[in-house]
Amino acid sequence: MALTLEALAARFGGEIVGDGRCEVRALAPLDQAGPRQLAFLANPKYLAQVETTGAGAVLIAPGDLEKLGAAAHGRNFIVTPNPYAYFARVAQMFIDLAAPPRAAGVHPSATIDPAAQVAASAVIGPHVTVEAGAVIGERAQLDANVFVGRGTRIGDDSHLYPNVAIYHGCTLGPRAIVHSGAVIGSDGFGFAPDFVGEGDARTGAWVKIPQVGGVKVGPDVEIGANTTIDRGAMADTVIDECVKIDNLVQIGHNCRIGAYTVIAGCAGIAGSTTIGKHCMIGGAVGIAGHVTLGDYVIVTAKSGVSKSLPKAGIYTSAFPAVEHGDWNRSAALVRNLDKLRDRIKALETALAAREGDAGGA
């Protein structure tokens, strides 16, 4: 389906520069776009590509359009303060237009407990299981092999992709998106040590602590593939509104993730940790348990957080990649820091003694 720039601006805003009747059918990168495609400039370092792009129109920020000067003549633009966000909204619209909603109903192979409540407008795919007391909201879509445990509530307009498992006693707010393989509500990692003795004479066991809380997920949350969110030990694990979680993230029991926070892939967050609003957690970050991150905290990739970070800011503890030889030299220096410290102390002591002797003379 083709849409004019005028139609896009009427829906999403922005100022048209050029021909508002220009029609676009899809989006594409600046260096690949054709005359029926819409491109966007989010990073000024690619400004030169705007001069050569074949795109029918470009989403651009006001300042970048000014930098183009005469090169903008004869081209079509939608000028907006945030071209990247504008692009995202247009892309979602094109997807919605290309893939109309599936027909409501329950697939014959699905297993729905008679005590469950499934909205008539919901879409229940093949081999889905919905246990007793579960509630599936209006227009929710559960794809093949989804499991929804007893008493769990799935909000309106949510989409659970194939092979998602939502354990008992959990809540997903409206418009939640949960990707394949994600598990929400599995037991938190809670074991009480009950050992006596020392060494080889030590006897006893780890005693499992029942995890009787749930997981509460707010509205407009997206959870990536193969991500796991543990249920609380006594109170709920809470994921606040508009949180976006990447693939392969582990969130321990009793954590609370503040609204609008984003968490990149392979991050691990130990139990009872609180992360504030509008935080950004980089890939492979490890966060210890029982710590608190304040609002607007950014932790860069592969950093380890072992204590609370209450103040907004950017935090890094990862060692950036360097050439192999440089790393070996740095590692050798680190291994010998204690010897270097002892030598410096000895030199300082000798220097102090010499200065003392000179003063006495």
From Swiss-Prot:
Report the top EC class in one word.
transferase
What processes does the entry annotate via GO biological process terms? Answer: lipid A biosynthetic process
Gene3D superfamilies in UniProt: 1.20.5.170, Hexapeptide repeat proteins, MurE/MurF, N-terminal domain
Its UniProt pathway annotation is:
Bacterial outer membrane biogenesis; LPS lipid A biosynthesis
Q: What is its EC number?
A: 2.3.1.191
Q: Cite the record's note on assembly.
A: Homotrimer.
Q: Which residues form the active site?
A: H253 (proton acceptor)
Q: Does the keyword Acyltransferase apply?
A: yes
GO cellular component terms listed in the entry, alphabetical order: membrane
Q: Which CDD domains match?
A: LbH_LpxD
Q: Name one GO molecular function term.
A: N-acyltransferase activity
Which PANTHER family has this protein been placed in?
UDP-3-O-ACYLGLUCOSAMINE N-ACYLTRANSFERASE, UDP-3-O-ACYLGLUCOSAMINE N-ACYLTRANSFERASE 1, MITOCHONDRIAL-RELATED
Keyword Acyltransferase on entry: yes
Which protein family is it in?
A: Belongs to the transferase hexapeptide repeat family. LpxD subfamily.
**What is this protein called in UniProt?**
UDP-3-O-acylglucosamine N-acyltransferase
- InterPro entries attached to this UniProt entry: Hexapep, Hexapep_transf_CS, LpxD, Trimer_LpxA-like_sf, UDP_GlcNAc_AcTrfase_non-rep
SUPFAM superfamilies in alphabetical order? Trimeric LpxA-like enzymes
The UniProt catalytic activity note for this protein reads: a UDP-3-O-[(3R)-3-hydroxyacyl]-alpha-D-glucosamine + a (3R)-hydroxyacyl-[ACP] = a UDP-2-N,3-O-bis[(3R)-3-hydroxyacyl]-alpha-D-glucosamine + holo-[ACP] + H(+)
